[in-house]
A protein has these predicted regions:
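A short beta-loop-alpha structural element at the N-terminal edge
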Residues: 1-18
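Conserved GNAT-fold acetyl-CoA-binding loop/helix
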Residues: 21-43
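A short helix-loop-beta-strand connector motif used in the catalytic cores of GNAT acetyltransferases and
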Residues: 43-55, 64, 76
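Glycine-rich acetyl-CoA-binding "A-motif" of GNAT/NAT acetyltransferases
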Residues: 61-64, 121, 133
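A conserved beta-turn-beta hairpin within the catalytic core of GNAT-like acetyltransferases
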Residues: 69-78, 87, 134
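Conserved acetyl-CoA-binding loop-helix of GNAT-fold acetyltransferases
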Residues: 82, 88-101, 120, 124, ...
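Conserved GNAT acetyl-CoA-binding A-motif
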Residues: 103-115
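Conserved beta-strand-loop-alpha-helix junction that forms the acyl-donor binding cleft
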Residues: 113-122, 144
């Protein structure tokens, strides 16, 4: 496996970003199809903003990617995705390790991770890597027409979900 720095959006990356967005929507019960044009636009925005982006190449094929955001020497994993056929083969570990290398280069001990609450695989992955501290929660107003289906409790607070 090779981890390469990405400097321009490619069709392969656009497809993976589109698949990542489909997967994220599925965590809320939304069925959608990959939008490769939107995936390309998203990747181009990351690159234009100067976000470090890396891809994992396995046997000449793109297997996954990670997008990092560096804010005042704090590194956030903005998104990380591995294609189904490459999961559980060390690809996510290699990509996440790259994010940790960036954090270490700033003298930081941790990477901050955006994770959807229903993304149980990612939460389990992060736990195995020692990420067990809940740092922030994101709170917003409901979208027009959005129907929440659950209540999530964090400490003494309850939130629609």
């Amino acid at each position: 496996m090779e981890i390469i720095k990405i400097t321009q959006a490619t069709d392969y990356l656009a497809q993976m970003v589109a698949l990542f967005r489909v997967e994220l929507r599925s965590y809320k019960g939304i069925v959608s199809k990959p939008n490769v044009d939107a995936g390309r636009e998203e990747m181009e925005e990351y690159l234009a903003a100067g976000f470090p982006v890396f891809a994992a190449i396995v046997d000449g094929e793109y297997a996954g990617y990670v997008v990092c955001r560096v804010d005042s020497e704090v590194v956030w994993v903005e998104s990380i995705f591995v294609k189904d056929e490459y999961r559980r083969h060390g690809v996510a570990t290699a990509l996440h390790s790259k994010a940790e290398e960036i954090a270490a280069s700033y003298g930081e001990e941790t990477v901050y991770n955006y994770v959807h609450p229903n993304n149980h695989r990612m939460i389990a992955f992060l736990r195995k890597r020692g990420y067990t501290v809940l740092n922030l929660i994101e709170i917003r107003k409901p979208y027009g027409g959005e129907k929440t289906t659950k209540i999530i409790k964090v400490g003494e607070n309850e939130f629609d979900y």
